[in-house]
């Protein structure tokens, strides 16, 4: 790709990566929003917006459709035993949320804040904290260092920074919401099943906010950083 912009063909290749994201984990679908930040100055503004938002819609439709398909899969015996022992019922949990939205909302927000630090401490563990997996922490550290410190010539606009922040918050919030529905006891004030590795995409996204400098001088590396975040 050119240092100043990318072609529609190259943009489509990037979108294929974005489509793979929700197929791996639906809550990371927010990362696909990075396509809105890619430089396409050689394309008319109206057409550029149409392509970007259209591609984003495709990612959401494909990811959402695949997620609905996977909900038809039966859980294994180990999961079933846990769900039964912990009185987990997604249908009743949703009914509780809808019937006590205000009460649940306050408790959920407080839970998001209180459990965040504990979740970060799990970044070097895999599964239910039974297996040490230090490489996860290494991946996060390398990604953070690459985006934040190596590329000193990247400067995002205020709106771009705001969008990236929303993507990060969205990943964390919807990961917790998904676990609250599928792994947490009905009416519980805590979220069960959260693992630090779920936050690696969020940390990589937020690390992009640390870049400073003139983005016009180094847009090639800017595209590389966005692609690295998507792949990882």
Descriptions of predicted regions:
Residues 1, 190-210:
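Hydrophobic/aromatic-rich transmembrane helices and adjacent perimembrane loops
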Residues 2-19, 221:
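Short hydrophobic alpha-helices at membrane interfaces in multi-pass membrane enzymes
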Residues 12-18, 45-69, 162-170, 227-231:
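Hydrophobic alpha-helical membrane-interfacial segments at the cytosolic entry of transmembrane helices
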Residues 14, 18-35, 133-145, 198-205, ...:
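Conserved beta-strand->loop/alpha-helix structural units within folded catalytic cores of enzymes
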Residues 26-150:
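Membrane-lumen/periplasm interface segments of specific transmembrane helices
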Residues 40-43, 71, 176-183, 211, ...:
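Transmembrane helix-loop junctions and nearby membrane-interface residues
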Residues 155-185:
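Transmembrane alpha-helix segments characteristic
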Residues 218-230:
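Interfacial loop-to-transmembrane junctions
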